Amino acid sequence: PDWKQTFEPHPAEMLFDLEKDPDELHDLSAIPEYAETLYKMRQALSDHIRTTHDLGFFLPNSRTGHILYEKVRKEKYPLDELYGLVEIAGTATVASLPMLEKALASPLPEMRFWGVVGYANLARENQINTCPQALLALLQDENPYIASEAAYAVVYLGKAQEGIARLITPAQEKDRKIGYSSLECLSLDPEMRDYIRPFLSELKEAAENLPRLANEDAGLMARGILVNL
C-alpha cells in the first residue's frame, strides 16, 4: 500500500514527476528514459551544495558552543572532501571501501559519521558481510551519533548482539534517544526483529518508566519499537 512507503528504506536518490505525481509515490530514478533528467538534477544539487557551502551534513552536536558558519571558515574545514564523502556514502559500492575506511579513522567526527553511513548502506544491501575492526571500535566513539550509526551498521555485519546492546544502553542517559532512533529503524526491518527481542525486558522497562508525553520522549520511542516487534 502507498502509505507503507514512508516506513520502508529508500534509495539515496529518488525522482518524481510532481505534476503527475504530487504525492511522490512513483519513483522514476531507475527508469532509463529518465536517466538524463536524473543526472542533470544530481549535478545541479551537487553544484548547489558546494556553491552555498552547505552545512547541513554536520552532526547536531557540532553546533554547540560556537557558530558553525564561522568555525568552518576559521579552521578551513575541508568541505569539498566532506561533500564528496556524503555523496559516496549514499550510493556506495565495494569500490568505495578505501574511501570509507579512511573516513572511519578521521579525527573529524563528520567524516567518521558519513564513513559509517557508507558501511551501513553496504551492509544493509548485502554488498559486504564482514565487520571491520575499525567500524566495531566506533561503538565506543565519544560522539553518540557516530556510535549509534556504527551500532546500526554492525548489526547487519554479524555483530547484532554488540550493536543492539549499544543502542539499548547509551554511554550517557541524555543520549538514549539517539540510540533508540537507530533501534527504531532496525525494528522496521522484519529480518532484524528477532535480534532485538532478547532485549524486550529492557525496552518494556523503558516504556513504563521513562518520559512518554512528548513526541520524542524516550519512553514513547521505546513503546514505538515494541509495537514494531
Tell me what each language-model feature is.
Residues 54-56:
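Cytosolic regulatory/linker segments at or just downstream of nucleotide-handling modules
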